[in-house]
UniProtKB/Swiss-Prot annotation:
The gene is ispF. GO terms for biological process: isopentenyl diphosphate biosynthetic process, methylerythritol 4-phosphate pathway; terpenoid biosynthetic process. It comes from Clostridium botulinum (strain Kyoto / Type A2). It catalyses: 4-CDP-2-C-methyl-D-erythritol 2-phosphate = 2-C-methyl-D-erythritol 2,4-cyclic diphosphate + CMP. This is 2-C-methyl-D-erythritol 2,4-cyclodiphosphate synthase. Homotrimer. 4-CDP-2-C-methyl-D-erythritol 2-phosphate binds at residues 8-10, 34-35, 56-58, 61-65, 100-106, 132-135, 139, 142. Keywords: Isoprene biosynthesis, Lyase, Metal-binding. Its cofactor is a divalent metal cation. CDD domains: MECDP_synthase (cd00554). PROSITE patterns: ISPF (PS01350). Its EC number is 4.6.1.12. Involved in the biosynthesis of isopentenyl diphosphate (IPP) and dimethylallyl diphosphate (DMAPP), two major building blocks of isoprenoid compounds. Catalyzes the conversion of 4-diphosphocytidyl-2-C-methyl-D-erythritol 2-phosphate (CDP-ME2P) to 2-C-methyl-D-erythritol 2,4-cyclodiphosphate (ME-CPP) with a corresponding release of cytidine 5-monophosphate (CMP). Pathway: Isoprenoid biosynthesis; isopentenyl diphosphate biosynthesis via DXP pathway; isopentenyl diphosphate from 1-deoxy-D-xylulose 5-phosphate: step 4/6. It is an enzyme of class 4 (lyase).
Amino acid sequence: MRIGLGYDVHKLVEDRPLIIGGVTIPHDKGLLGHSDADVLVHAIMDALLGAAALGDIGKHFPDSDKNFKNISSLLLLSKVKDLINKEGYKIVNIDCTIIAQKPKMLYHIDAMKKNICKCLKLDNNMLNIKATTEEGLGFTGKEEGISANAICLLD
């Protein structure tokens, strides 16, 4: 059994779609990044790679590689799944938290969960996604960015 921890953060900017968990969420700003900047999926990828001692997403999908420009993070997550499976690991469970003042994530969590479970070929009870605010504190509380944490267990 191996545990992995992932974290990601991206700045909110105008003229970008807000994509979290593979879901495009209506909002006046989106996340800035080389790929689609999906903080939730990025945190999950780092947790999985960390648990398997395979580095991080920057190692496998560098932002200097134009092939990853605006790519769907779900496609990258599928590649991470293949990497950990190749090493003989299977996902036992994943638990995640999205930290955002706005927009409210509650209404999108089921769709996020469906996307990620489909991508990783997980049963619904193997993935948990929560959302919280920081009550107006810090960069997420001031709506300057969104972050996500993920922890996973591999066997």
